[in-house]
Amino acid sequence: MAPERRERMDDACLKALRRIEARVARLEQAVLGGGDLLRAALNERGLKVYRCNPTDRLLLPEGAPDEAQERLYALLNRYSFRLYLRDAIRLGLFRPEELTRFCSRAAALRYGRFLESIGAATPEGDALRLTRPVSSLGPTLEWYVARLFERELLAPAIYGVKFRGLEAGGDFDVIAWLAGELAYAEVKSSPPKGIEVAEVSAFLRRREHLCPALSFFIVDTELRMKDKIVPLFEAAAPHQPVVRLHAELFRAGIATYIVNSRRGIAANIRRCLLEWRRRR
């Protein structure tokens, strides 16, 4: 290749890189600015956060580097990996090649090596043991969904949120500043059969205290919502009709969305958000 042509290509690549860097900077600024709006929205409601973004119950070891966090977030996008983690947590000590209920043996081995590489699991004989004695995937799933709001929807988010003096009690799993409004998401790592009407009622009470513009009840499953979750909402709030939006996505009342994981959590939230915007 002629030197002149190579130089032109280098200049073009450099300009493209600068455009990408500028775009990333604009996106980062948008997210950071949105964080101020999120805090302002909570302050307007008289809500004082005394805990958020806890790390003590995450799969990641304390002080995990950013690279490990990014790699975990990327792999959590795979539903099969999330199911694999549930089995690993249930067992505590496990042989990666045996966790093949939801993935191939090759994938199970890759997942095991990955957990070891980020410090989330340590070898013990011919098996692995999770580094932290977590009892549920729930907190890590909340962490993941908060990041998903930020990365995929450019919505600043906090997770595992507790407020002082709030009668509703319990954690608010994820709170985000989404599309210029306050949004609240409950995140369930249990399959539908493990969810009861009391949990739906508690979610609805927290929603009433927070007064978000829209809220999501996210169940990390590809199973049907109509069979178990929809009847729970109908029992907990009979005055709020539940309507099907598409496949297994539903709206309860004005702006509460029932979401599962089929076709991806981010894609399903986008579909709900579009429906919400069209009705405004």
Residue spans for each PLM region:
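Intrinsically disordered, low-complexity Ser/Thr/Pro/Gly-rich regulatory segments
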Residues: 2-280
